[in-house]
Design a protein with these regions (language model features):
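Residues at the starts of beta-strands that form the adenosine-phosphate
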Residues: 14, 49-53, 166
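A Rossmann-like FAD-binding core segment of flavoenzymes
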Residues: 38, 42-149, 204
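FAD-site-proximal beta/loop scaffold in flavoenzymes
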Residues: 8, 118-187, 197-198
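Single conserved hydrophobic/aromatic residue that forms the stacking wall/gate
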Residues: 1-12
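Short hydrophobic beta-strand segments
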Residues: 13-24, 54
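Internal hydrophobic alpha-helix adjacent to the cofactor/substrate pocket in enzyme cavities
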Residues: 39, 185-211
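C-terminal auxiliary extensions adjacent to catalytic cores
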Residues: 226-274
């Protein structure tokens, strides 16, 4: 992402950041780049020349109540408009325009209002789904919110397939109601492994995953809002952050994000140590 362009004296004046209507890898990613762009422009002294707009298909900015108030405050403090219930329908790159639909419900009536926004810089989050082979193999959900995108139909606690008891699924492709992040996968791996071994031995899978996920939302260069939560959308804070008020952005969480998580992933998780 060329943030140096967003904060430069070049022809970038209107920047648009979008979030989509499907589950996707790291739900906080569109928020991070938006806030980092704003802070970078301030650091370069060009913030007064830049208009940022955030568009999301969701009905709220963030669906974890413990962290939402502060996140809303940050957007308001930085004068970044939040546009809810809006879907991207197309992008005209030659005209530098995004075609949106505003979706509203009045009673039982669904009202769809199309509109167009001009941009100089666009950060677009596309809709995401499971690979076609998952859908074609009949492994995905066939009903409910996760069916349209064919995420694998597993029990949210044991991670065992609802129909095929010899299949265990985890990570981005698993159809479970939590965020698709490496932090979530880190907690899912031992659950999935132990339950798979139990199945291979003809035993019942007893290990249970509580939906833990973490989304370190980078709010500026030096601070992170460390969102850790479970299936109930309640805080599930790890040590040592359990001794700190994590409803606010933290410098210590920035250190974790920048200097610890990457080596933990590549040297620890990928080698089975973390």
């Amino acid at each position: 992402i060329p943030l140096r362009l967003v904060g430069s004296e070049m022809c970038i004046r209107d920047s648009i950041y979008t979030d989509t209507y499907t589950k996707h890898k790291c739900g906080g990613a569109p928020k991070k780049i938006c806030l980092l762009s704003e802070h970078y422009a301030r650091k370069q002294g060009t913030r007064d020349k830049l208009q940022l707009n955030y568009f999301t298909a969701s009905k709220e900015l963030y669906d974890i109540p413990y962290f939402t108030p502060r996140l809303l405050e940050i957007y308001n403090e930085r004068n970044i408009p939040i546009n809810l219930n809006v879907r991207v329908k197309g992008v005209d790159t030659s005209a530098k325009q995004v075609h949106f639909e505003k979706i509203e419900t009045k009673g039982e009536e669904k009202i769809v209002t199309p509109f167009v926004e001009d941009y100089d810089f666009l950060h677009f989050t596309p809709p995401m789904s499971a690979p076609d082979f998952v859908r074609d193999a009949g492994l995905g959900w066939t009903e409910g919110k996760l069916a349209a995108d064919a995420w694998v139909m597993v029990d949210k606690e044991t991670l065992v397939h609802k129909k095929y008891q010899n299949i265990v699924s985890l990570g981005d492709v698993a159809g479970i109601p939590t965020s698709k992040t490496s932090a979530a996968i880190r907690k899912q791996v031992p659950i999935a492994a132990k339950n798979l071994i139990a199945l291979m031995e003809g035993k019942e899978p007893t290990e249970k995953y509580n939906g833990y996920a973490a989304c370190p939302i980078v709010t500026d260069y030096g601070h992170v809002l460390l969102c850790e939560f479970d299936y109930e959308k309640k805080p599930d804070v790890s040590f040592p952050f359990s001794m700190i008020d994590t409803s606010k952005e933290l410098w210590l969480a920035w250190i974790l994000k920048v200097y610890i998580l990457k080596p933990m992933y590549f040297n620890g998780m990928l080698n089975g140590y973390a």
